[in-house]
Structures are given as C-alpha cells and as structure tokens.
Amino acid sequence: MSMEEPELLLYEAQPGDSIHSVAVRFGVIPAEVESPDPLPANQGLIDPGQLLLIPRRLTNIGPDERLIPDSELIFSPHASDFNTVEFADAQGGYLSSYRQTVGTQWLSGAEIVERVALNNSINPRVLLAMVEYIAGWVTDPSVPDGDAFNYPLGHVEEQIPGLYRQLTWLANELGNGYYGWRAGTLTDVHFWNTGSLRLAPDLNAGTVALQHFFSIVHTQQVWEGAISREGFLRVYEDLFGDPWAYEYPLFEPGVEQPDLILPFELGKIWAYTGGPHGAWERESAWAALDFAPASSISGCVLSEEWAVAAAPGIVVRSDNGTVVLDLDGDGRAHSGWALLYLHVDHKDRVPVGSLLDEGDRIGHPSCEGGVATGTHIHIARMYNGEWILADGPLPFDMDGWIARAGSKPYQGALVKDGQEVLACSCASQESLITR
C-alpha cells in the first residue's frame, strides 16, 4: 500500500444505514463506500450486516462502545408490552406518588412517562432510567423541593417546569441525537461550554442519542462518566438488566413503504403547508408533512373537509387530536408500518378499533392537539416504532408525490414526474395539490 492510500476499514452495515449517512459519519464521499456485494443504486437502505470497505480519514474521535440497541431507545415492538405504571409502583419511589395536570388530565408521574413515551415514540424504559439517573425518583421515596421538584431532569428553564415538560425536552433531545445520526446531519457532540468531539463513526443511533443528550448538559469530563459503564448504563442495568436482551431488528432487508395516497378526498384541492419537519416535537425527526384544506379564512377555523386513510388499516389510537392507523393489522402502533395523523378535530373523529379501507374518512382537519396556527392535518410514518424521515432512504411517497426537505423544517417540496409543489404556510398557488 502506498503512503497516499488510506487504510481501509471494514464496517458491518447496521439497520437504518444508507450510503449517504455512512459516508457522512466516516468523513468520506459516497463513492468511496465500497462493498463486495451490490449496494443500493439510489440512496436506499443498505441491508443490515452487509460488509462495507471505507477509507479511514478520521482522527481524534470519541468512545466507540455501543451502549444500548436502537430498539431500546425508540418505542419498538419490545416496549409494547411494558407496563410503565406497574413498574414504577413496584419500585416505590417518588415517581409513583407525583401528580401533575397535563392538558385537562390529572396524571401520575408514571402516566406522564407513559404519555411522553407514546407521543414521541421513545422507549419508556429509557425515560425511566433517565429519571432515576438524574433525579432518583424511580426508587427514592423522598419528596424533593425547590429546583429538584420543579426541574427534575436538571434543565432549569422557566418555560419547562414540571415532569411533563422536562421529559418532553429530554425526548426531543434524544430524538435529535438519534435521528440526526440516521440522517447524517449530526457528526459531533458539543459539550456544555467546553468544545466538541467527533463521534465514532461506527456507533449506532441509540448510543449516539445518549452521547448527544449528556453532552449538552455536561462538560466533557462529566460526560465521559455519564456514558461509561458506571454511569447511566449502570442505573439502566440495575432497573432492567442487559439492554441488549431487548434488541429487535428494526429494518429487515428489502423493507419498502406500502402504497399511500394523499390524505384527503379525491377531487379536492388542498395546500401543502409544511414540508418535512418534526414528527411530534418541532426539532426532532423530520418525518411529518402538513396539508391544509382550502379556506377563505386563515387561522384555526372549523372545516367540513375530510382527512382520509392513506392506506388500509385499523385505528389503534384516537384522542387529543391524534389518530394512529396501524397498517399491518396486528393492533399495535409500534410494530410494522403505522401512520400518525395530528390535529384531527374531535367532531366525527374515527374511533379506536375502526377498520378502514384506503380513502375512508379519518376526521376533520383542525388545530386540536399540539401547537398549530391554522387548521391542517399533520401526517407522519412509523416503522417498528421508528419515525421514518420524510426525505430519507425510504422517502414519503403519496400517489407518486415524493417529499423533498428544505434547509429548514417546514420547507421543501413534493415532486412527481417533473412537477413540483412547494411547501408554504401561506397556501399560495404554488402549494396547491389535488388527488
């Protein structure tokens, strides 16, 4: 080997890897990623386990120990049978007696963990372990006071007091790490007030989520302790055992999006008001798209238009402006393909248990559920509990319209056969689309 030729690294593709994301993480261009076996012709997913040859170009990288599997960071099928309330009650800590109003409901601490896990599709075991690691609330019955009560996860900010908002902030940051690694937009951790470090390129997304979260709240020295085997992982293992015992293969070889139609009725004209943006929280996985019905009045107004099922499925959730449609018919939102509809008005909203065909009515668009400035429908895809990036290796495809992201959330376009529909909250002529 000549001096000019870099050493070649042998890397085994992980579920969710694409040529683009792998190249970014290893600091090479996509053409330098090679394999003894055929690679995807487009930017699709690489089969898990496929061997890749990649030039070594990075130096001074962070720890490369994988802490938890991806399936233990997100709300994967293995989390579906976990009972958060029963577990917390059995531990006897303050979490089981904590109460807080969320929306119009009075929830226990464990119910809040359950709500945040479900909404953000983050594994409840990880959230519980974080609450224990940072606050000790899972096993310690002592009643906290002051900032320890108001800001249990240590993020002291006036806008996010209480366990619900603290956990929502945590879930968003874990998602930023996880999906930033998936998308190839995150390559470094940035420590609290003390610089940054390049992430080891062969880490998995679940581990990166933890490394990212601990970096934004700690100096590098404290961060190193948090991600060591005697840090967060020790607390997790004390509560739940070996995280790798819960490993679940999230993406099998050849996985494809099922056929989807645009989520409104045939012949209707709607506006494409939001390109790829956060599936639940605004900053996390850019998995969602927004559509709004035609209206002469802006803002949150009543609409008689209908959002419809983009594919056949069974309704497994219908509450608080939210409808989740399970596409594989097993009755579980976090196994196989599922669609999230947000901002569905309570009037005429389809109930849980409904079996829908493609094009059947879901409900009316509104501002109900979450933050919204105008009547619309927000739609996102999940596969085995993972939000699927709208402009990723499995692009959002509805009636042949393919989502393309912009440089900022909510920007972008839908493209089909040389046509382009631009995302704009203004509902301009360029944003109009019809089935």
Language model segments and positions:
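Primarily a LysM-type cell-wall glycan-binding module
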Residues: 1-29, 50-52, 56, 68-115
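Acidic, glycine-rich catalytic/binding loops that coordinate metals and/or anionic ligands
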Residues: 258, 301, 308, 351-357, ...
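Non-catalytic cell-wall polysaccharide-engagement segments
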Residues: 154-273, 410-435
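Alpha-helical segment that forms one wall of the substrate-binding/catalytic cleft
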Residues: 95-119, 125-128, 134-142, 155-202, ...
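Short glycine/threonine/proline-enriched tight-turn/helix- or strand-capping micro-motif at secondary-structure
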Residues: 252-255, 259, 270-309, 341
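Short alpha-helical segments in extracytoplasmic peptidoglycan/chitin-binding modules
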Residues: 13, 18-36, 49, 117, ...
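A structural signal for short beta-strand/turn segments enriched in small hydrophobics and glycine
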Residues: 272, 309, 313-315, 353-365
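Zn2+-dependent peptidoglycan hydrolase active-site motif and core
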Residues: 302-352, 374-376
